[in-house]
Amino acid sequence: MRLLAFFFLTAAVACGQSLAGEIRLEVKDATGAGIEATGSIEGLATGVHRDYRTDARGTRTFTGLPFGTYRLQIGRDGFAAQSVRVDVRSEAPIQQTVTLAVAVIATTVEVSDSVTLVNPQATSAAQYIRPEELRDRESGAPGRSFIDLVNQQPGWLLEANGVLHPRGSEYQVQYVVDGIPLYDNRSPAFSQSLGVDEFDSMNVRTAGFPAEFGRSLGGVVELNTNHDAVPGLHGQMSYQAGSFDQQSGFASLQYSRGRNAVSLSGEGFSTDRYLDAPVEQNYTNHASGGALSARFDRTWSAADSTHGYMSSRHTGFLVPDEQLQQAAGQRQDRTAGETLGQVSHTHLFNARVLMQVRGMVRDTSALLWSNSLSIPILPTQDRGFREGYLGGSVSVTHGSHELKAGADSLFDSIHENFGYLITAYKIGTVRIFDRDVPQSFQFSGQRDGRQQSAFVQDQWHKGPLTLSAGLRFDHYGVVADETAWSPRLGAAYSIPKAGLVLRASYDRIFQSPAMENLLLVSADLSAQLGGGAFLPLRPSRGDYFEAGFAKSILGKLRLDGSWYRRQVDHFADDDLLLNTGVSFPIAFSHAEIRGFEAKLELPHWGPVSGFMSYSNLLGRGRLPVAGGLLLGDDAQSLVAGAGTFPITQDQRNSFRGRVRVQAHRRMWLALESDYNSGLPVDLNVADMAFLRQQYGAAILSKVNFERGRVRPSASFDASAGVSLYQVDRKSVRLQADVFNLFDRLNVIDFTGVLSGTALQAGRNFAVRLNASF
């Protein structure tokens, strides 16, 4: 009882979100003296592989290790090598001492790779992006590298402009950077994207969420900037160039001495294809941007450490024109910026109790400007928000229990200014706006909001059985005042002789509405917009169910399979203002989504590695619609409507695959492919002659108007990399990528004239040079 009382009282004053632990290695000889050693740490199930060298005292700390099983290899000339198994199950550091014996009298101890291939305690599937995949990733378009990596995972798909959709969800993607959550849309069209070069590890999950995760639970992407501190000065640089006049660069420096480590990084880019163009000509699609960031780590003692991170990012880009807009001379400029600072402190009370406290402040902004030749609408926007975050958690290891409790608060100050001027109600014979829509409109709003949460969770291990349970409380107080209790349950059963883990999970979810244009869509402006109908936006509530398995095959491959079902009230989606890229959150009264996912992964088998993944999804939404910028007659039909329909992310079949071959110790080759069966089409213009004039016969041939879907798309990419120089930590690598190898015309979305139609880029290439020391 005293332990539980301490647990909850400390949590009340101390919720960082991180499912990662730490191993503190100490290597000794037979006399007990510390000795310098080298080796590697590997976890095939968690995608971790790091080579290391201890210091002269034989110590080395490995941070940011996702929960799972690891193999530590330790060696030194004149001593027998050893490999040991270490299970990381909590955030509390694990002290691992290894004694090396003289080679002539020692017996080598080995732990096979297959031990780490399947995580026997995982109650849900989580996809871990290996360091090799981060390093040798395709040279994606600016702002899309980490988005493309997530899109390779089962259950995820991309709509126009790099917007990620996990298991049919719109918006509800949570990004956790060093344990601090970011809930707003991070796609290029919405905000400044995160650069992948500054991150050391990445993992993705779509179910089995511990109670510490909340507010946005379509899917969670965890990004970690932790690097194991290596004494001295180190750095890396990269330069990328390719089609569409693309150029980008990244550089970072890290210096570590004693208990301190500091790093600085910067990046910049310029391209003539930033967003997904609506027509093949790729009109007005230029963008440029940059970012600066800094990190500071201080280890005060074996029990205390502090981490700080700051970044500033800014992007300016043009909105791609369609044919008639280009002919009219339209130009629309958008900018997105973010400045962020965060700090965290970890205190280890003893080997079983760990406390973490985190804080963050950030300021984001988004602007839209249109020239006088914009058609059929001239929109303007100036929005942003300032956000403060404060949270803490306490983790306790007690026998077979891994307990954790915590609380956090978000403090938001939101401002929005939006306006439009209609410059054409009709284009030719095609009506774009109803006559009762006012020609001009202006909105200005400001509001402070608060969100609070608290949680408690436990994971219990007994032999082959793992059980997890948690309870979360949320209060939302921005545009509504609602509370929710959300239980979470999970179970896993391991059958080691069969290399099989069976698992199941249940998540009750409570999700906040998206931040973009939130004040506008929450105000009843129907009388000013010619609609006469309005429903207020509310948080989403729902239930997620999943059952699945993980199977080791021949000790080399891992097969993951998951069946899932989601039932959500007030299902979040978005309402795009024609093709401006300005989006307004909406919610359908209810949605049900079910599907199956599978992934076959080969971490490495000799020179070969790779994966194949398949996703099947069926999603139906139900009217009416709340929120949004609903103009004219659309408001009545959507707000007062009834019936069901395919959700906008209802893509039945998706396939992803990649194979990589280490053809030579200095050269590798890779092929990557993807297939998408096609998204639903919401056609707002039935005049086929007009559509043909705007898009051409080639694009229209990619749309099945009878079925109301985009026709299937497929793409093949090829990559090659060569190590030009490699000595210890110094390396120079060159990589070349060719995308859409067969130059296939792929339509991502087709929603009619001026309403967000998007095309995948044709055949293009990129070359990237990397250097590190």
Residue map of PLM features:
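Periplasmic N-terminal accessory/gating domains of Gram-negative outer-membrane beta-barrel systems
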Residues: 78-80, 84-97, 105-211, 215-227, ...
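Surface-exposed extracellular loop regions of Gram-negative outer-membrane beta-barrel proteins
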Residues: 314-316, 322-323, 365-367, 415-420, ...
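C-terminal beta-signal and adjacent terminal beta-strands/loops
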Residues: 666, 674-696, 711-715, 722-773
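Transmembrane beta-barrel wall of Gram-negative outer-membrane proteins
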Residues: 241-270, 280-316, 333-355, 487
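Gram-negative outer-membrane beta-barrel transporters
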Residues: 461-466, 563-567, 586-685
